[in-house]
Amino acid sequence: GDELIRARLSSEVVLINDISGYIINAGGKRLRPATVLLAARALGAQGDLPCLLAVVIEFIHTATLLHDDVVDHSDRRRGAKTANAVWGNAGAVLSGDFLYSRSFQLMVEADRMGIMRVMADATNAISEGEVLQLMNCNDPEVTEERYLRVIELKTSRLFQAAAEIAAIAADAPAQQQAQMAAYGHALGMVYQLVDDLLDYTADPEVSGKNIGIDLAEGKPTLPLIYTMRKGT
């Protein structure tokens, strides 16, 4: 798991190793790579390809975290300082770029066009979701539909891709690939819905995050959208 991540992370540029290693070593639930590995196992995938793809997914996720923290001006994540708080915005953004490009190097190594297609579409969707979220910020008119579209693109699509590329790696028939994609999509939607609720209800000692960060950043998530709807 983490050993393979660290091995594939290495760069000749020391600062890239420092920043990328810092955020990966900070922990996290590894839900997205776990989705790849569990879906691949469920479909009987053989060989090392699922492990390689799990690293791809984790690198892309980590890149999005590096960029997100800069966009959101965040200085804490998982109870520790963010990379941008330690090294500055430029170092964090450029290290995120490195992780994106390294993930595509690994996909070329996998040499499966179907996997490349899914991941190219997913990374494009994530970027669109981030921009849509930016457009929604500080907008009291955001609807439930607009909110759901943001979480579908910025969160759910990577879970969807994780499950779908596992099915491709297992040489599963097209119907099973579609079913795995649908499962990943649902998992990602539920994950983000719960995460957004926890922003209002979680214990900071347990979650490692302060309460009300989304509200402070002007992000209208579903709890706020419902509250504003019911409160008028």
Which residues does each PLM region occupy?
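Mg2+-dependent prenyl diphosphate-binding active-site environment of isoprenoid biosynthetic enzymes
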Residues: 6-232
